[in-house]
Regions:
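Noncatalytic scaffold domains of N-terminal-nucleophile
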Residues: 1-14, 18-21, 26-162
Length: 162
């Protein structure tokens, strides 16, 4: 299959390309790359995060969005923290709240959906088994990998707001 794979860390992209070379389709490659990315750069793309996957099925012209955004508790409402907002986060993602309510404590917890969504996308639109897609990530976790400079820096810096 012709194709290309993009990922923040080269090793993840390379594993996605290998998935294509081994006969996998685009979803097999994307899931494989995502799982490897979660191992080699866990602060940016880990299985505890959130996101989405867009799939285009050329044979049917169908566009599909696989949602893996975290779920919150049943008592959460859209205006839950409106009166607690101090301002936008320095990095432009989200907001800083009084008492770090969205970062620390029980109210900050969302149920990650990444594993469920990747597994579901693979079983519905892929051709590989979960075990085949997960194998490269397991291999990288076992043998180790070079830590990117940004990750090493993040691990050394104490928590700061925003």
């Amino acid at each position: 299959m012709n194709g290309m794979v993009a990922a923040p860390q080269p090793v993840a992209a390379e594993e996605g390309v290998l998935a294509l070379r081994r006969g996998g389709n685009a979803v097999d490659a994307a899931v494989t790359a995502a799982l490897v990315q979660g191992v080699v750069d866990p602060l940016n793309c880990g299985i505890g995060g959130l996101g989405g996957m867009q799939i285009y099925r050329a044979e049917s012209g169908e566009g599909i969005f696989v949602d893996f955004f975290s779920s919150v508790g049943a008592q959460a409402t859209p205006d839950l923290w409106v009166d607690q907002i101090l301002g936008p986060a320095v990095d432009g993602v989200g907001f800083i709240l009084r008492g770090d309510l969205n970062e620390i404590g029980y109210q900050s917890i969302g149920t990650p959906a990444t594993v469920r969504a990747l597994s579901g996308a693979l079983s519905r639109y892929g051709t590989w088994s979960w075990e085949e897609a997960l194998a490269p990530a397991i291999a990288w976790a076992r043998k180790g990998y070079p830590i990117p400079a940004e990750l090493a820096r993040d691990w050394r810096v104490p928590y700061a707001e925003g």
